[in-house]
């Protein structure tokens, strides 16, 4: 909502005070008026732009002794009504007033007002506009609009102040470059995005149905057949190829809005822009891009069913060749209404971070996995891109983009039996250099094995779906920390909050490999608070004795881990079972912690109770058989 402050300026005797009085009284006041009227505040009335709350009108004097007050009021205003009434005061507009405004460093729109039109009956409206106003508008871009008024006849008085309000609420300057006679680049970019979002079937045209939906969204009234024909005819006059049986293309849509701006109907363009959440500087509203969304400690964010449905539909619409994957051109088209790929995707080497087909194109599985990971690691990024990409909530109680997300239950006590209430989990893959961490991530994404060793410097991430026993699926994020490993492991609070499982890897064929793991756990003792899975990689090579205080199986037994290290090779077909094991450890964390003595004693007690129950049941059966046998003899 806007508060409009109008500063009325001009030479002495041009009728500034009479215009203000005529506005307030509704008629011309013949009595003598004081030289400078006090400030007045006008509440919204019929015809006031809907986003204006109050309008303040300030009268000023052009006398030299009042110059400091004049400068102060000009700086406080957000629009200037500049009044002239004869040839002398008209000449002063260009020679004094407009240069004076510039010297003050103000950047506000100016509405030029030719007052006392009742005294210039020999000049027609068109002549005044052509000879006086248009040359000034061409020279001074700060002039938003012009109008002829008469305070005596109460002619166009209300309209003059309405133009001032509109100059604030619907400014022309951000939209149109009158010198170039073209829409400004930022306006074109915004309108291109609006066209893209309104083109629901992504065929490059706004069909009649899409135009009707667009009309209802922006103006809340239906588009008549007459208006539809008129729009197409208007575009066809200058861009014949922009109108086709399929509808109007983006070029025609941009041209239509350019015509609105040229003809002073820029209010129409602003209504369109604001319907799509644009601000006065043509950026998207901050509250729209970044709505309030809190994730409590030990909880996480995930896509809701509506969020997944949106990204599925977006993928299907963007897969133009129907090959089941998004190629570079299709991805570029999909992200056209956004600033580009999310920064985290570029840092994570997308699309190599997710599932691709043989041609290297991102599959639907990989697309959803990537967004699941983004939502988990940075829900604000997902919300921002949902806004850019045109997500529309079907939930009337929550019309914002947050309807596409949900928050999981906090998981604080991981050692308590039971599954965590989340479908996306994160595992850090730790191990010495050369242990096979990168090969593990490649295998997770079904990539071929490479014998060439490339040490990981930058962090690397992989995300994919894992099918758990029973048929339930979850998204598993595995990352290799690279040079950031010390910083991430030292941040205990963040590590325990975000990480769901630690995967310790070592090369079973390298005698110096395993010693890294006990040293790491000793250096960062809080790692013991996270579920753990030990994996012996390169099991296709000869296993060797480790030069460590304890052998791997002895170390895990000493920790009372539920199982010994898993011996696997990325060249084996059974490799996928490792990822199921890792996902299960994250989803049911109590199964991946060292078993305490109470757990072991409890297990033996359970066995004892079970055995005792069997013995008792057997003895009871014998007694019953004997009784039955005895009664039968």
Curated annotation (Swiss-Prot):
Keywords: Calcium, GTP-binding, Hydrolase, Membrane, Metal-binding, Mitochondrion, Mitochondrion outer membrane, Nucleotide-binding, Repeat, Transmembrane, Transmembrane helix. Ca(2+) 2 binds at residues 319, 321, 323, 330. GTP 1 binds at residues 10-17, 59-63, 115-118. The keyword Calcium applies. Residues 1-170, 422-588 form the Miro domain. One of its GO terms (biological process) is heme transport. One of its GO terms (cellular component) is ERMES complex. Its EC number is 3.6.5.-. Residues 408-418 have a biased composition (Basic residues). Residues 625-633 are mitochondrial intermembrane. Residues 186-221, 306-341 form the EF-hand domain. It is an enzyme of class 3 (hydrolase). It comes from the Eukaryota. CDD domains: Miro2 (cd01892). Mitochondrial GTPase involved in mitochondrial trafficking. Probably involved in control of anterograde transport of mitochondria and their subcellular distribution. Belongs to the mitochondrial Rho GTPase family. This is Mitochondrial Rho GTPase 1. It comes from Aspergillus oryzae (strain ATCC 42149 / RIB 40) (Yellow koji mold).
């Amino acid at each position: 909502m806007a508060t409009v402050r109008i500063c009325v300026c001009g030479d002495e005797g041009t009728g500034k005070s009479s215009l203000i009085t005529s506005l307030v009284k509704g008629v011309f006041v013949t009595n003598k008026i004081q030289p400078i009227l006090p400030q007045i505040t006008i509440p919204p009335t019929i015809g006031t732009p809907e986003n204006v709350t109050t309008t303040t009108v300030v009268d000023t004097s052009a006398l030299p002794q009042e110059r400091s007050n004049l400068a102060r009021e000009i700086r406080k205003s957000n629009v200037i009504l500049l009044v002239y009434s004869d040839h002398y005061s008209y000449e002063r507009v260009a020679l004094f007033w407009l240069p004076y405004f510039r010297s003050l460093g103000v950047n506000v729109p100016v509405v030029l007002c030719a007052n006392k039109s009742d005294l210039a009956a020999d000049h027609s409206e068109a002549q005044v506009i052509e000879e006086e106003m248009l040359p000034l508008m061409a020279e001074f871009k700060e002039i938003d609009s012009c109008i002829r008024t008469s305070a005596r006849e109460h002619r166009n008085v209300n309209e003059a102040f309405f133009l001032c309000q509109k100059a604030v609420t619907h400014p022309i300057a951000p939209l149109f470059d009158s010198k170039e006679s073209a829409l400004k680049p930022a306006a074109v970019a915004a309108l291109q995005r609006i066209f893209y979002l309104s083109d629901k079937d992504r065929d490059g045209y706004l069909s009649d149905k899409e135009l009707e939906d667009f009309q209802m969204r922006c103006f809340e009234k239906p588009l008549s057949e007459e208006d539809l024909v008129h729009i197409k005819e208007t575009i066809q006059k200058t861009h014949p190829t922009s109108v086709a049986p399929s509808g109007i293309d983006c070029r025609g849509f941009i041209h239509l809005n350019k015509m609105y701006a040229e003809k002073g109907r820029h209010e129409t363009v602003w209504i369109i822009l604001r319907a799509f959440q644009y601000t006065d500087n043509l950026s998207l509203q901050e509250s729209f891009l970044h709505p309030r969304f809190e994730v409590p400690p030990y909880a996480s964010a995930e896509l809701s069913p509506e969020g997944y449905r949106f990204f599925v539909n977006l993928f299907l619409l963007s897969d133009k060749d129907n090959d089941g994957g998004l190629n570079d051109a299709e991805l570029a088209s999909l992200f056209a209404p956004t600033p580009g790929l999310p920064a985290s995707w570029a840092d994570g080497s997308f699309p190599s971070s997710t599932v691709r087909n043989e041609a290297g194109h991102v599959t639907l599985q990989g697309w959803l996995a990537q967004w699941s990971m983004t939502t988990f690691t940075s829900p604000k990024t997902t919300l921002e891109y949902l806004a850019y990409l045109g997500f529309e909530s079907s939930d009337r109680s929550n019309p914002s983009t947050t309807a596409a997300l949900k928050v999981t239950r906090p998981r604080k006590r991981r050692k308590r039996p039971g599954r965590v209430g989340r479908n996306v989990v994160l595992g850090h893959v730790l191990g010495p250099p050369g242990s096979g961490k990168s090969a593990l991530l490649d295998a997770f994404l079904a990539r071929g094995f490479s014998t060439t060793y490339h040490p990981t410097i930058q962090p690397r991430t992989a995300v994919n779906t894992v099918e758990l026993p029973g048929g339930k699926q979850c998204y598993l994020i595995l990352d290799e920390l690279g040079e950031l490993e010390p910083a991430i492991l030292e941040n205990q609070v963040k590590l325990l909050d975000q990480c769901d499982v630690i995967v310790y890897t070592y090369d079973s064929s390298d005698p110096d490999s395993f010693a890294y793991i006990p040293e790491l756990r000793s250096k960062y003792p809080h790692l013991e608070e996270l579920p753990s899975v030990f994996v012996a990689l390169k099991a296709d090579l000869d296993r060797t004795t480790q030069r460590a205080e304890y052998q791997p199986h002895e170390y895990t037994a000493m920790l009372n881990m539920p199982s010994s290290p898993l011996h696997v090779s990325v060249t084996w077909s059974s490799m996928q079972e490792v990822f199921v094991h890792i996902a299960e450890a994250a989803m049911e964390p109590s199964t991946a912690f060292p078993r305490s003595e109470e757990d072991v004693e409890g297990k033996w007690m359970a066995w004892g109770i079970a055995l005792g129950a069997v013995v008792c049941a057997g003895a009871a059966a014998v007694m019953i058989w004997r009784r039955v046998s005895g009664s039968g003899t």
